[in-house]
Amino acid sequence: MASLPVSFAKPDKNGVITCKAIMLKEAKLPGMSYADTVQIIDIQVDPPQNVELRVKMLCASVCRTDILTIEGFMAPTQFPKINGHEGVGIIESMGPDTKNFKVGDVIVAPTLGECQVCSSCRSGRTNFCQNYGANESALEPDGTSRFSYIDSDGKKKLLYYKLGCSTWTQYMVVDSNYATKLNEIAPELPPPHGSILSCAFATGYGAVWLDAAVQEGDSVAIFGVGSVGISAVIAAKELKAKQIIVVDRNEYKLKMAMELGATHCINSEKLPEGVTPSQAVRKLTPKEVGVDASIESSGYDVFMNEAMKAAIHGKAKTVITGEGIYENDRIFFDFKDFLFGGNVVGNVTGRVRIHSDFPGLLRKAQEPVIRAGMDKILGYDAATMKCKYEVDIREGTPALLKALEEVENVDCVKLVIKLNDY
C-alpha cells in the first residue's frame, strides 16, 4: 500500500462529496431477489465531524453477516442503508477533534474500539470495550447520518449505517475511535488483505490465538471453513497444534483447509447414520476425550452445540464466532454439557483489540506462510492484483448482482468489491 494513489474527489462548497455506493432499499425477504433490494446509486457524504474520519474506500469484502443484513436478519435493521463492515481505505479528511491520524493514512475500522481505560480494556481479557462497543444504532453516535441521497421525487433522504461504518461505498465516514492504521506497520499489504484483516481473518485467527489460547501440541476442531474457519486453520498451524480437525460439507473448502494445515477433515453430510460431527471429532482424539479447543464459525446453531460436545469438558474452550439465523435469536445448548464443564465464549473480531493486538496481527500477516494463506482465502493473483471473486462498483448494478449470487458458489470463499483504483 506504500504507493497507493492519494487523489481525492473534489467536495462541493459545503464540503460534501458525491460518489457511488451500494444501497439496500429494503430487506430481501423470501421470494425476493437481490435485484429487488440492492442497487448502485449516487450518494452524498457529508464532511466528518468531531473525531470522525472521511475515508476514500479502496475495497470492501463481503462477510456472511452482510448477506444476513441484506435479508433483514441482522441488527441494525433500518432501511435504506449502506451495507458492509469489512474494508480498507485512505483518510481524505478529519473532524476538528481527531488525534493520532493524518490525511493519507490507510485504515480499517473493526467493529469494536478500544479506549484502553475502562475495566474491560485494562483486564486484557476481552475486546468488548465499555466506551466504544459495537455501534448497532445505524447512525453516528450523535444520532445523525453522514450519508444521504436524492430520491425519485427529488427529496433528500438519509441512509443508515452498518455497524457504525458502512464500507460498500466509495467514501465513508467513521468515528476514529473505531479505526486503526495499516500503513505504518504493513505498507506493502495489498488492499484486499487489509480488508479481510478488519473482520474475517481477525475473527478466525484471533479465536485460536487469543480466545482459545491454543498451545503447541494441542488438538483443535474447527466447525465451518469459510473465510473465518480457514483463518482459524492458519492460526492453529502457526501455533503448532498437533491435531487440526475441520468439519464442513463443502469439499472444496475442506480441501483448502487441508492444504493450509488441517490434519483431518470431516464432511458432515457423509457421516455414517447415527454418527454426529462431535462424535466423529472425538473418535480422532486420544481416548476419544475431545479436543483442547473448539471453534465454531459456520453460524449454524446445531454446529454450535456440536462444537461444545467435541471439546474436553472442564478444560477446553468452545469459541463461537459465527452469526446465523436462529429462531427468536435464541440458541439452545444441552444443559448437561454445561453442567459437566462446557465452556462456551462468544467472539467478535477474534478478541483482537485494535490498539493492543492489531499491530501484532498486522506483523503476522506479513509472514510468508500466513500471507500465502490469505492469498488462498482471496484467490489473490499478485501479478494482476485481482481476486478470484471480485467486482468493481463502477461496473454497475447488474455485475454486482451477479457477484452477490456467486457468493453461494462452492469455490467462493470471499467476494471482494473494488471501490476505487489501487
From Swiss-Prot:
<dbReference type="GO" id="GO:0052919">
    <property type="term" value="F:aliphatic (R)-hydroxynitrile lyase activity"/>
</dbReference>
<dbReference type="InterPro" id="IPR013154">
    <property type="entry name" value="ADH-like_N"/>
</dbReference>
<dbReference type="Pfam" id="PF00107">
    <property type="entry name" value="ADH_zinc_N"/>
</dbReference>
<comment type="function">
    <text>Involved in the catabolism of cyanogenic glycosides. Naturally occurring substrates are the aliphatic acetone cyanohydrin and butan-2-one cyanohydrin, which are the aglycones of the cyanogenic glycosides linamarin, lotaustralin, linustatin and neolinustatin. Can use various aliphatic ketones and aldehydes as substrates, but not aromatic ketones.</text>
</comment>
<keyword id="KW-0862">Zinc</keyword>
<comment type="subunit">
    <text>Homodimer.</text>
</comment>
<dbReference type="GO" id="GO:0005829">
    <property type="term" value="C:cytosol"/>
</dbReference>
<keyword id="KW-0456">Lyase</keyword>
<dbReference type="InterPro" id="IPR011032">
    <property type="entry name" value="GroES-like_sf"/>
</dbReference>
<feature type="binding site">
    <location>
        <position position="121"/>
    </location>
    <ligand>
        <name>Zn(2+) 2</name>
    </ligand>
</feature>
<feature type="binding site">
    <location>
        <position position="115"/>
    </location>
    <ligand>
        <name>Zn(2+) 2</name>
    </ligand>
</feature>
<dbReference type="Pfam" id="PF08240">
    <property type="entry name" value="ADH_N"/>
</dbReference>
<feature type="binding site">
    <location>
        <position position="199"/>
    </location>
    <ligand>
        <name>Zn(2+) 1</name>
    </ligand>
</feature>
<dbReference type="GO" id="GO:0008270">
    <property type="term" value="F:zinc ion binding"/>
</dbReference>
<dbReference type="GO" id="GO:0051903">
    <property type="term" value="F:S-(hydroxymethyl)glutathione dehydrogenase [NAD(P)+] activity"/>
</dbReference>
<comment type="similarity">
    <text>Belongs to the zinc-containing alcohol dehydrogenase family.</text>
</comment>
<keyword id="KW-0479">Metal-binding</keyword>
<dbReference type="GO" id="GO:0046294">
    <property type="term" value="P:formaldehyde catabolic process"/>
</dbReference>
<feature type="binding site">
    <location>
        <position position="85"/>
    </location>
    <ligand>
        <name>Zn(2+) 1</name>
    </ligand>
</feature>
<feature type="binding site">
    <location>
        <position position="129"/>
    </location>
    <ligand>
        <name>Zn(2+) 2</name>
    </ligand>
</feature>
<feature type="binding site">
    <location>
        <position position="63"/>
    </location>
    <ligand>
        <name>Zn(2+) 1</name>
    </ligand>
</feature>
<dbReference type="InterPro" id="IPR013149">
    <property type="entry name" value="ADH-like_C"/>
</dbReference>
<protein>
    <recommendedName>
        <fullName>Aliphatic (R)-hydroxynitrile lyase</fullName>
        <ecNumber>4.1.2.46</ecNumber>
    </recommendedName>
</protein>
<dbReference type="InterPro" id="IPR036291">
    <property type="entry name" value="NAD(P)-bd_dom_sf"/>
</dbReference>
<feature type="binding site">
    <location>
        <position position="118"/>
    </location>
    <ligand>
        <name>Zn(2+) 2</name>
    </ligand>
</feature>
